[in-house]
Amino acid sequence: MVDKLTHLKQLEAESIHIIREVAAEFDNPVMLYSIGKDSAVMLHLARKAFFPGKLPFPVMHVDTQWKFQEMYKFRDRMVEELGLDLITHVNPDGVAQGINPFTHGSAKHTDIMKTEGLKQALDKHGFDAAFGGARRDEEKSRAKERVYSFRDSKHRWDPKNQRPELWNVYNGKVNKGESIRVFPLSNWTELDIWQYIYLEGIPIVPLYFAAEREVIEKNGTLIMIDDERILEHLSDEEKARIVKKKVRFRTLGCYPLTGAVESEAESLTDIIQEMLLTRTSERQGRVIDHDGAGSMEDKKRQGYF
């Protein structure tokens, strides 16, 4: 029967199976919602998994307060339209210290507002499993991570201490204080994601589509002028270099740390065609991935998703 399914239907069935397994095995799961395309697909799959009922777990957004404005608008619209049980968490310590990506740099901003914020939220609500939309094709440390990614009581990941996963059998045993991060989209590619969004009609943030936007090039990365805060950290010479270009985003994060790409792709079919021809990683525009050799693995060892 499986052999008669299309490639995307096989991926869909695998992801739904994983989501249902976690809901059945764990006492208090949560689905992380970063508002991006992978989160949109994962949320769609979860709703399919339990249709016509509601999700048996909440969704949670760890807010750095530096997401694109269109992302916040989209999040609020989805919560209202889908009736989601949304938890938002902002690291109060980071807010008190005034942490931001300009003054403190990408590494410290990510550690305090994302990693520590996530760990705070998981501890506060006692979640023992957290769904995430990471895929193995994104980045080398994610490529070697299991679907069930076990974390110790400090939320740390040890890549040398992973359990075997045979076929579709997952070992969900955890000791008190431990938890897992689970990745239902592990075996999907960026192209799979876009084709599935097209076929299923899944809503996504408009920033994924090419449009004329104000940007400034910093260290080879096109940074979008999303709100007034960025202007406070630009010199007069830099402000003079702000230009309008037709750009879109292949990945979405904190806007000062996420680069746009020049593109003509204004529709889903345009994006799919672009994906068939591209030879660069979607995360080439993520500044945090360039903090140092092995930076993503180091972040994950400390509790980053």
From Swiss-Prot:
The enzyme's E.C. designation: 2.7.7.4
Catalysed reactions, as listed in the record: sulfate + ATP + H(+) = adenosine 5'-phosphosulfate + diphosphate
GO molecular function, one term: ATP binding
Stated family: Belongs to the PAPS reductase family. CysD subfamily.
UniProt subunit comment: Heterodimer composed of CysD, the smaller subunit, and CysN.
Single GO biological process annotation from the record: hydrogen sulfide biosynthetic process
Keywords, comma-separated and alphabetical: ATP-binding, Nucleotide-binding, Nucleotidyltransferase, Transferase
Function: With CysN forms the ATP sulfurylase (ATPS) that catalyzes the adenylation of sulfate producing adenosine 5'-phosphosulfate (APS) and diphosphate, the first enzymatic step in sulfur assimilation pathway. APS synthesis involves the formation of a high-energy phosphoric-sulfuric acid anhydride bond driven by GTP hydrolysis by CysN coupled to ATP hydrolysis by CysD.
Pathway(s): Sulfur metabolism; hydrogen sulfide biosynthesis; sulfite from sulfate: step 1/3
Protein's gene: cysD
Enzyme class (EC, first level): transferase
Name the record gives this protein: Sulfate adenylyltransferase subunit 2
Pfam families in the record: PAPS_reduct (PF01507)
CDD domains: Sulfate_adenylyltransferase_2 (cd23946)
